Amino acid sequence: MTTRRNFIKNTAKVAAALSLPVVTANTFGFNILHKDLKPEDTIIGHGDFKFKVDKGWAKMSANTNPILNCHEMVQDSKGRLIMIGDHTHNNIIVFDKSGKILEYWGHSLPGGHGLSISQEGGEDFLVMTDCGYFQDKNGDWKAQTGQVLKTTVDGRLLFSIAHPKTIGVYKPDMKFQPTETAVAPNGDIYVADGYGSDYIIRYDSNGKYIHHFGGHDSSNAAHNLHNAHGIAIDARDKNNPVLICTSREENCFKYFTMEGKFIRKVDMPGMYVCRPVVNGTNIYAGVCWSKDSAGKMFGNSGFVTILDQSNKVVSNPGGTPPEYKGGVLQQVYQAPEKTFYHGHDVCIDEDKSVYVCQWNAAFTAPVKLTRV
């Protein structure tokens, strides 16, 4: 994937070169942005979706619980907030809503990236992806084949899903670097191969292959995916659940039936959107990068975006206000006063607070946005 690969190349030895002092979350990289603005004074967002920024929410030490990239977060049935990252000291960190760490585990996912949660028989289960990117012994970022794992909520492995070439779905030379999963109500697992070959691969609840779609080879370009970074099940219409897939290089979401038939595209101009997160009647997403006025993508330009029931953008916390002309969304930019580096995922709790995970963000912990 071009964007991530370029940024990895440019920052290849940062983590190896930097020593991490013992600090609390209040100085966990958050001092770099907003040096002259107190976190409690910062309100971001638009319309009915405005938030107070709490950059010191996570009560943690970089020495005890180091973070490279804070990738994704979900909330379990007990209200706990579960984060996945790619530091093998603690791939999984579990917080309570006050930001206190309850537990941490996981040492085998150097590319820990995607995290989904499902319930079966009243029990929570996690589905994780290792996207294949890892740091070698010299601190250089490299790529290898990724994997998907289904575990209990405390980390007991149930099964893993390997390279699709092992079952004849991919050709031997095709890459498999999965970035995300979505779990259907019946337990079927949809895997987004966002850093690999851009297919959406469907398995049953036991990891048996069903079918796949997407990729780059459809004669109808609208059906193709380019950096299929995220996927979610949109059940806002309970009688007609559909899949929302990220085509991040195209700055859009694409809708498909649960069987993989293309429905429509929702353009997100200037926004390199990550996984869509459906909450109530809204869709939230992290924006990893945005573009400048010349249409060029640049680093440290992320924010969060929120869409309504009609897939109209209603707020861009950390970005510029949404503007529509003739029913068409105009390009959205990062706000002049930076709040985020690279918005990679969001988790929304029952109070409608938003927890923002960031990639390549100076080792920062999740940032809490409290609805105001």
Residue ranges of model-derived segments:
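N-terminal secretory signal peptides and thylakoid transit peptides that target proteins
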Residues: 1-18
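Blade/loop signatures of beta-propeller domains
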Residues: 32-54
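Surface-exposed loop and turn segments in beta-propeller and other repeat-based domains
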Residues: 56-64, 158-172, 176, 210-223, ...
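Beta-rich, blade/repeat-based domains predominating
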Residues: 63-77, 109-123, 134, 167-186, ...
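Blade-loop segments of beta-propeller domains
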Residues: 90-93, 97-123, 130-132
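Asp-box/WD-like beta-propeller blade repeats and closely related beta-sheet repeat scaffolds
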Residues: 110, 129-184
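Loop/turn-rich, solvent-exposed surfaces of beta-rich toroidal or solenoidal domains
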Residues: 271-320
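Blade-level signature of beta-propeller repeat domains, shared across WD40, Kelch, NHL, RCC1
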Residues: 342-372
